[in-house]
Amino acid sequence: MTELQQKATSLDALAEIERQVLWLSTAIVHHANRVRPNPGGLKVGGHQASSASMVSIMTSLWFRHLRADDRVSVKPHASPVLHAINYLLGELDESYLPTLRAFGGLQSYPSRVKDPDPVDYST
């Protein structure tokens, strides 16, 4: 159990973690579409609303309820939330956060094969 998971014993603590997850997942998508150089100008992907709709549920699961043998299938457009949670849990190196949809980077749909962080099911 990580330090963050141990702190998530109250609703206030869980709400603070939820804010961090929302901010990180939004920043991951924003960087992919607005910050990373993109000569063609096309949106490369990421769905902030689809991610935001899952932040509360996924934060509660990962920081309060999941047991070691539990497995979760994450809806495809919520992968930035999964990556943010894995980062906060120490299971994803910070260097990957700005790599959504980049070659060799984080996938926009969770992938057990291509993502560098733990994914239970590819979707």
Which role fits each region the language model picked out?
Residues 40-45:
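Short, surface-exposed loop/turn segments at secondary-structure junctions
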Residues 9, 13-21, 25-39, 50-123:
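Cofactor-binding active-site loop characterized by glycine-rich and histidine/acidic residues
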Residues 1-10:
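Short, contiguous pre-domain boundary segments
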